Amino acid sequence: MRTLFIGDLHLSADRLDITQAFNRFLDTELDDADALYILGDLFEVWVGDDLAAPFALELARKLNQVSQRLPIYFIHGNRDFMLGKQFADVAGMQMLPEVTCLDLYGVNTVILHGDSLCTLDKAYQRFRKLRSFAFARWLYSCLPKKKRQAIANKIRSNSQSSNQQKSYVIMDVEPSAVDALFAQSHCKQMIHGHTHRPAIHEFTNGCKRIVVGDWYEQGSVLVVSSDGVDLKSLPFDAS
């Protein structure tokens, strides 16, 4: 048996090829799987469950069918932090805290989206702190639909522009933040996404940090079993 981890699909109506590849993944890659974990940014943008796009609702029905065979767990990312219980229930996804510890075949593992580890990006961390307040999310959800969409589009545009000007180092995880999370969680293994830099980092103290990749040009999935970990790429034309 095996457990699969994915993240950073950034699904949108503008990139239905990614949605199609994800559907093929759901059809072909989950045989004998114990569970599927989605580590955030499943969608490029999410302004509220009441504004879910038609393609997202169709995907929710697909995920719900899959959830009849195996559990699907979801952790919010920085793009879909407004995804709520209403949509999660329709999709058959179980929402997890932003930092979750679990036993993966005998290995204590901490999983998260990963944006909280990029502590050198001070501007983003200020925004992240603001959106962490339940009142701020509630206030946003009370706005008219068009206003919410406009704000989301503005944030997305500003983020893309800002990221182009930020250095490689600032947009990666900060080693001290990684060390702190290992210490706080008492785990030997960490799995996250967000940085779009798939890799398996092994430390001299025996700890391991695994980064799942994005789905812009090809799929990325981490397969964990009792035999170890396998970070795989899935070409869109063959996934």
Curated annotation (Swiss-Prot):
It catalyses: UDP-2-N,3-O-bis[(3R)-3-hydroxytetradecanoyl]-alpha-D-glucosamine + H2O = 2-N,3-O-bis[(3R)-3-hydroxytetradecanoyl]-alpha-D-glucosaminyl 1-phosphate + UMP + 2 H(+). GO terms for cellular component: cytoplasm; extrinsic component of plasma membrane. Its cofactor is Mn(2+). This is UDP-2,3-diacylglucosamine hydrolase. The lineage of its organism: Bacteria, Pseudomonadati, Pseudomonadota, Gammaproteobacteria, Alteromonadales. InterPro entries: Calcineurin-like_PHP_ApaH, LpxH-like, Metallo-depent_PP-like, UDP-diacylglucosamine_Hdrlase. The gene is lpxH. Hydrolyzes the pyrophosphate bond of UDP-2,3-diacylglucosamine to yield 2,3-diacylglucosamine 1-phosphate (lipid X) and UMP by catalyzing the attack of water at the alpha-P atom. Involved in the biosynthesis of lipid A, a phosphorylated glycolipid that anchors the lipopolysaccharide to the outer membrane of the cell. Belongs to the LpxH family. Mn(2+) 2 binds at residues 41, 78, 113, 194. GO terms for molecular function: manganese ion binding; UDP-2,3-diacylglucosamine hydrolase activity. Pathway: Glycolipid biosynthesis; lipid IV(A) biosynthesis; lipid IV(A) from (3R)-3-hydroxytetradecanoyl-[acyl-carrier-protein] and UDP-N-acetyl-alpha-D-glucosamine: step 4/6. It comes from Shewanella sp. (strain ANA-3). Its EC number is 3.6.1.54. NCBIfam families: lipid_A_lpxH, PRK05340.1. Mn(2+) 1 binds at residues 8, 10, 41, 196. Substrate binds at residues 78-79, 121, 159, 163, 166, 194.
